[in-house]
Curated annotation (Swiss-Prot):
Superkingdom assignment: Eukaryota
List of residues that carry N6-acetyllysine: K268, K306, K342, K379, K771, K775, K780
Start-end of Polar residues biased regions: 436-445
Domain Bromo: 696-800
Protein name per Swiss-Prot or TrEMBL: Transcription intermediary factor 1-beta
Region of interest called HP1 box, as start-end residue ranges on this chain: 477-514
UniProt main location, coarse: nucleus
Citrulline, modified sites: R471, R473
Modified sites of kind Phosphoserine: 24, 27, 31, 52, 140, 419, 439, 441, 472, 474, 480, 490, 502, 595, 684, 690, 698, 753, 758, 785, 825
């Protein structure tokens, strides 16, 4: 009996070890969990599936379950692998990894960590350590065979050849119903674990995965701190004090989040499809406009016979230049949008497929990759397509017959300005209006996203920058000549180019010495370095330098997830990043910082010159103010408010920021001030109390005054009041000393002594500044603006301090003899301040 029990124990140990070995994943982070999808996740999956385009084709759907190289169905014996781009391939079909020498030499990383692998489908490069096992396909190949094998298996404990209905884990043999009853009656086998026929599976038929360390423990917990699956023993030891969830809760929460992201991307993808069709229609309309103008020109030439033939040919050429330029931009824009559309279709198909799958293990292990792709696709800025501008030929038969040399011109209406051909201007005696203003016309959209595509369009020799005209309004008068091309240089976390193939988006990893090799992916959490170009001529390599030929970029918003961010490549003469101001669209989230130091992003992004209209400021007009500090109107290291989307230097904001804030940062104008309890007692205005201690504003009043002062700095009519003092060293010793916002800020920040001791004293200085500026100007418009500024300031003060009225103190008080702290203008103002 003892020998029989020992044999049974040995058999049970062998069976358990075999089960653990077959079920443990190669990465050591397998998962288990047989939870069914919650209703919310199922609804989100259905919504995502509905939003997925139907015209994707069978080949695109086939890529989800077949190898992208050999086209064979992915089975466990082929070791299916899932790449960061969400394409799958057999392990043997993946090309050999190429070491990234530049990365290893810069950071001292191991060769394995820096090895790069090319995706066989989209040619994207990724680190080999980021490639994971495709858990969705791990059990798919063996499911049918195991089911058929179990159906034909017979009981081995009796000679009746009865079909096996159960399986003893300790004895490792199938049992029929009769033997199961006998098995449970025998003393030495009644405690054995008898399961239904087949290997250990969860309720949904998903194979249980066991811990690599504790071989008999299934992975039943999800550690939120480490973002991985653990067993109970690991959670009590290696993951002690970590936040965790049971698989049921983790699967339910992750499915809801993924379903929400898929729905958002589906809606955005539908908008992109619509815009793509509109661009295609605009291309045809531009072609029709060209033909119509050409006919008008030829008909005019027939009226004045031979003397206008030469000028007529010039006008035809001018019309072709204008329309062909528009058509070329639209063709490139349409081509790029089509590429983005294809990539989004793949992401939608894969995410919907993952959500519809019952394999919860694979969903949790692959959710980081799916999150990353969904977030990046959602952050791509796609502006709506606007109708193209009208273009027609204008002429007067009687007047231009006498002036054949200056006959006619091509008028192309564009958003913000009108552009004519380079021919001579109309003579003064020409009757009739020369052109129509283009305030109601517009140009197609500008695509901004984070992918590079192959240049299979026929215009690869031109600047491959897909960009429309920025919206603005033209003033009175006529703008002649072609639009000025403004070079633009940007630094992004994703630096991509347009290569010569027509494959889906390509990720390049390290900057090279040539135009084609200028490719670097840097993915980091919570930071996005961006830049906007400035018009003008700059030396090569400096911010705003002219772009390299053949390069194009589309911008991408911040992503929230990081997948194996590579160390920064060493900066050399050809890879040194160019940092400029931050540019973000209206959908951006959280603050962003573009900094020349402390960042791992070193990719250089060169943007081809784009045709832009002259900047026109005014309400509702998109100008350069979105790319510069709201206070000093200069670029640099900026942080963006998550609510109002104003950008500030760290020192320009009030109060000054010591460190880069978090993602959900709000500026003082948007931040709700806490209800701070005011200090008891009142403070005198003489600058000191009975004990000789200098009086200061209470913390609550300090924050309120800073908020009001920041509102003045950001208020456009207050721009002339930023710095009125002309002395190199600010001083308020003279009673008639000039006051400006910079001096008031210095005193509020206690850079000048004495500091403000009450809100009334602060209001008196602002009122004194208004009155001084009123004396300096005789312009009626300036006088009216001062009245408006006083009302604006009084409203802000009343909003900040409740029912307290400050109208009485907005008069010039007796001059205060303030001792100068000897601070220079550079010390009193932030690094970007200035007139």
């Amino acid at each position: 009996m003892a020998a029989s029990a020992a044999a049974a124990t040995a058999a049970a140990s062998a069976a358990t070890a075999a089960s653990a070995a077959s079920g443990s994943p190669g990465s050591g982070e397998g998962s288990a969990g047989g939870e069914k999808r919650p209703a919310a996740s199922s609804a989100a999956a259905a919504s995502a599936s509905a939003s997925s385009p139907a015209g994707g084709g069978g080949e695109a759907q086939e890529l989800l379950e077949h190898c992208g190289v050999c086209r064979e169905r992915l089975r466990p014996e082929r070791d299916p692998r899932l790449l960061p781009c969400l394409h799958s391939a057999c392990s043997a079909c993946l090309g050999p990894a190429t070491p990234a020498a530049a990365n290893n030499s810069g950071d001292g990383g191991s060769a394995g960590d820096g090895a790069m692998v090319d995706c066989p489908v989209c040619k994207q490069q990724c680190y080999s350590k980021d490639i994971v096992e495709n858990y969705f396909m791990r059990d798919s190949g063996s499911k049918a065979s195991s089911d058929s094998q179990d159906a034909n298996q017979c009981c081995t404990s009796c000679e009746d050849n009865a079909p096996a209905t159960s399986y003893c884990v300790e004895c490792s043999e199938p049992l029929c119903e009769t033997c199961v009853e006998a098995h449970q009656r025998v003393k030495y086998t009644k405690d054995h674990t008898v399961r239904s026929t087949g290997p250990a599976k969860t309720r949904d038929g998903e194979r249980t995965v066991y811990c690599n360390v504790h071989k008999h423990e299934p992975l039943v917990l999800f550690c939120e701190s480490c973002d991985t699956l653990t067993c109970r023993d690991c959670q009590l030891n290696a993951h002690k004090d970590h936040q965790y969830q049971f698989l049921e809760d983790a699967v339910r929460n992750q499915r809801k989040l993924l379903a929400s992201l898929v729905k958002r991307l589906g809606d955005k993808h539908a908008t992109l499809q619509k815009n793509t069709k509109e661009v295609r229609s605009s291309i045809r309309q531009v072609s029709d406009v060209q033909k119509r103008v050409q006919v008008d020109v030829k008909m005019a030439i027939l009226q004045i016979m031979k003397e206008l033939n030469k000028r007529g040919r010039v006008l035809v050429n001018d019309a072709q230049k204008v329309t062909e330029g528009q058509q070329e931009r639209l063709e490139r824009q349409h081509w790029t949008m089509t590429k983005i559309q294809k990539h989004q279709e793949h992401i939608l198909r894969f995410a919907s497929w993952a959500l519809e799958s019952d394999n919860n293990t694979a969903l949790l292990l692959s959710k980081k990759l799916i999150y990353f792709q969904l977030h990046r696709a959602l952050k791509m800025i796609v502006d709506p397509v606007e109708p193209h501008g009208e273009m027609k030929f204008q002429w007067d038969l009687n007047a231009w017959t006498k002036s054949a040399e200056a006959f006619g011109k091509i008028v192309a209406e564009r958003p913000g300005t009108n552009s004519t051909g380079p021919g001579p201007m109309a003579p003064p005696r020409a009757p009739g209006p020369l052109s129509k203003q283009g305030s109601g016309s517009s140009q197609p959209m500008e695509v901004q996203e984070g992918y590079g595509f192959g240049t299979d369009d026929p215009y690869s020799s031109a600047e491959p920058h897909v960009s429309g005209m920025k919206r603005s309004r033209s003033g009175e008068g006529e703008v002649s000549g072609l639009m000025r091309k403004v070079p633009r240089v940007s630094l992004e976390r994703l630096d991509l180019d347009l290569t010569s193939d027509s494959q889906p988006p390509v990720f390049k990893v390290f900057p090279g010495s040539t135009t084609e090799d200028y490719n670097l992916i840097v993915i980091e959490r919570g930071a996005a370095a961006a830049a906007a170009g400035q018009a003008g001529t700059v030396p090569p390599g400096a911010p705003g330098a002219p772009p390299l030929p053949g390069m194009a970029i589309v911008k991408e918003e911040e992503t929230e997830a990081a997948i194996g961010a590579p160390p920064a490549a060493p900066e050399g003469p050809e890879t040194k990043p160019v940092l400029m101001a931050l540019t973000e669209g209206p959908g951006a989230e959280g603050p962003r910082l573009a900094s020349p130091s402390g960042s791992t992003s070193s990719g250089l992004e060169v943007v081809a010159p784009e045709v832009t209209s002259a900047p026109v400021s005014g309400p509702g007009i998109l100008d350069d103010s979105a790319t510069i500090c709201r206070v000093c109107q200069k670029p640099g290291d900026l942080v963006m408010c998550n609510q109002c989307e104003f950008c500030f230097h760290l020192d320009c904001h009030l109060p000054s920021l010591q460190d880069v804030p978090g993602e959900e940062w709000s500026c003082s104008l948007c931040h709700v001030l806490p209800d701070l309890k005011e200090e008891d007692g009142s403070l005198s205005l003489d600058g000191a109390d009975s004990t000789g201690v200098v009086a200061k504003l209470s913390p609550a009043n300090q924050r309120k005054c800073e908020r009001v002062l920041l509102a003045l700095f950001c208020h456009e009519p207050c721009r002339p009041l930023h710095q009125l003092a002309t002395d190199s060293t600010f001083s308020m010793e003279q009673p008639g000393g000039t006051l400006d916002l910079t001096l008031i800020r210095a005193r509020l920040q206690e850079k000048l002594s004495p500091p403000y001791s009450s809100p009334q004293e602060f209001a008196q200085d602002v009122g004194r500044m208004f009155k001084q500026f009123n004396k300096l100007t005789e312009d009626k418009a300036d006088v009216q603006s001062i009245i408006g500024l006083q009302r604006f300031f009084e409203t802000r003060m009343n909003d900040a301090f409740g029912d307290t009225k400050f109208s009485a103190v907005l008069v010039e008080p007796p001059p205060l003899n303030l001792p100068s702290a000897g601070l220079s203008s550079q010390e009193l103002s932030g690094p970007g301040d200035g007139p």
